[in-house]
Every structure is written in C-alpha cells, then in structure tokens.
C-alpha cells in the first residue's frame, strides 16, 4: 500500500525513528499507526541508539531564502559546544538549502542517514526538531534573520508589495530588515489580533475577571479595567499591535502605513515565522 509523507512524519514525531524505518514499519503494519509504533519497538529501532534517550535541549536555527521559497530549520543537540561545531553548522546550512530548493519539509531517507552519521561522529543526540518552508510570490519580499553567533533564534518576515517596481527600494528593505529584528526581539505569537482564537481571548478575560473579584470596585469600573487589560495583553502578542522596535510611539501597523506612504506603494505583512532553541 502507499504510505504518505504525512503519515511517516507523524510516526517520526511520535517515536524519533528515522524516515526509512518509519516508512518500513508503516508498510509492514498496513498503515496502522499504533501497530507501526509496536513494529518499531520490535525492530529495536526506538531504543537501539542509547543516545536517543538523552535530552537535546540545545541546538541551532538555520535559514535559507531564494527567489521561490524561504525556510527555517531547528536542529536540536545536547550541548552548546556541538551547536557551534563546524560539521554541525555545515550540515545544517546544507540541509536547509536542500529543503528550500526542493520545497519539502520532510527529510528523505538519505538525509535521515546523514543525521544518524553526524550523531555517531559527534557522539550526541541530534535530530531535526522543526522545519518550516514557505513559498514566495513574485510580488512578495522576504527578510530572514538569525540572532547572534549561536543562532538560537531565527525568523523571517514576508511582505506583499502592491507595486513590484518598489521591491528594491532602500527604505522598504531597511524597514523590512528592521521588522525581522523586531520579531526576533519581541517574539509575537500572532500577526494581528484578528488571528487570535476566541477561546484564548475568553480564557484570558476570565483570568482578569478572577483577578478583580476582590477589588471591591463597582461593576462598570471592573469591566473597564478588564477591557483595558485584555486590549493591552492582546496587543503585546500580536505583531501589528506591538510598539515598533525602533520607535515605540508607533505600532508596527502604523509604521507599515508610514513606510507605504514614503515609497508610494501599499505594503502588507502577510506572514512571519519565529523559531528558537529551547
């Protein structure tokens, strides 16, 4: 039977086993997820490598962008020393380039084997923790950024530009890079308040209500305070509502509008991604 890459990835995430081993186990199990997990244990795959049981709390973020796609990759390891290892860094840079150029966010069998070989050479538990690949349209501008020598934080920000002739504008590109730095510094969870799920908003509102239960203030005053607290909190986790890193008198949304007027073209942030070690 045909085994989809998504099924293989799900089993990989659950067991930590390699791509080829997961695919084989799923094939033998006829696609049954739980049976495939059992088959991996029977094959000795899940527990065979003693290093696989050790915590991998360190790591490094890698990024690559071309004209068609941008990607972020987080490879986990056990120590900061290995995260700075030249072989580890070279492997990560090569892997994210391969993934971006192929448009895949799932490793193939050869790439899985390369990770196993690197782990055996370095003698640490090493694995791909997160991969994110995003396509770039012809009217979109992307800026990526890795923070510090250890690259423990990696981000990209994607902009839609109405006038494609403005893509090379210096003011636009400087602002785009500044916003990538902003995302690295403030780690927003959402693009806008509208992207925040209603359940989260309701839960947060209930938290603020419990905090005000013993305040002794009139109900209308309490409602106003809760409304203010909620607005402030949501603004802190939504990128467009955050105070811009280089001028906190303006929100990011207001800064975008300002730059749009400067370059005489509407610009819009359509996507961002933030990855960090730990």
Curated annotation (Swiss-Prot):
Keywords: Cytoplasm, Elongation factor, Protein biosynthesis. Its main location: cytoplasm. PROSITE patterns: EF_TS_1. Residues 79-82 are annotated as: Involved in Mg(2+) ion dislocation from EF-Tu. Pfam families: EF_TS (PF00889). GO terms for molecular function: translation elongation factor activity. GO terms for cellular component: cytoplasm. It is found in: Cytoplasm. Belongs to the EF-Ts family. Associates with the EF-Tu.GDP complex and induces the exchange of GDP to GTP. It remains bound to the aminoacyl-tRNA.EF-Tu.GTP complex up to the GTP hydrolysis stage on the ribosome. This is Elongation factor Ts. It comes from Borrelia recurrentis (strain A1). The lineage of its organism: Bacteria, Pseudomonadati, Spirochaetota, Spirochaetia, Spirochaetales. The gene is tsf.
């Amino acid at each position: 039977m045909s085994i989809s890459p998504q099924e293989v990835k799900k089993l990989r995430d659950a067991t930590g086993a390699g791509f080829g081993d997961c695919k084989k186990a799923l094939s033998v199990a006829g696609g049954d997820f739980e049976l495939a997990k059992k088959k991996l244990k029977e094959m000795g795959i899940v527990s065979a490598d003693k290093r696989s049981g050790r915590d991998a709390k360190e790591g490094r973020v890698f990024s690559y962008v071309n004209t068609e796609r941008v990607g972020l990759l987080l490879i986990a390891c056990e120590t900061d020393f290995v995260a700075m290892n030249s072989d580890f860094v070279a492997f990560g840079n090569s892997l994210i380039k391969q993934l971006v150029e192929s448009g895949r966010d799932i490793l193939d069998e050869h790439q899985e084997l390369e990770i196993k070989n690197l782990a055996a050479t370095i003698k640490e538990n090493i694995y791909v923790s997160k991969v994110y690949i995003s396509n770039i349209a012809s009217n979109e501008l992307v800026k990526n950024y890795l923070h510090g020598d250890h690259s423990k934080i990696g981000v990209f920000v994607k902009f839609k530009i109405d006038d494609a002739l403005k893509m090379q504008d210096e003011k636009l590109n400087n602002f785009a890079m500044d916003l990538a730095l902003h995302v690295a510094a403030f780690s927003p969870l959402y693009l806008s308040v509208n992207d925040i799920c209603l359940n989260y908003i309701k839960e947060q509102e209930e938290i603020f209500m419990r905090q005000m239960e013993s305040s002794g203030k009139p109900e209308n005053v309490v409602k106003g305070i809760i409304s203010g607290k909620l607005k402030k909190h949501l603004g802190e986790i939504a990128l467009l509502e955050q105070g811009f890193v280089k001028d906190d008198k303006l929100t990011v949304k207001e800064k975008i509008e300002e730059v749009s007027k400067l370059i005489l073209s509407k610009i819009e942030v359509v996507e961002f991604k933030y990855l960090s070690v730990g």
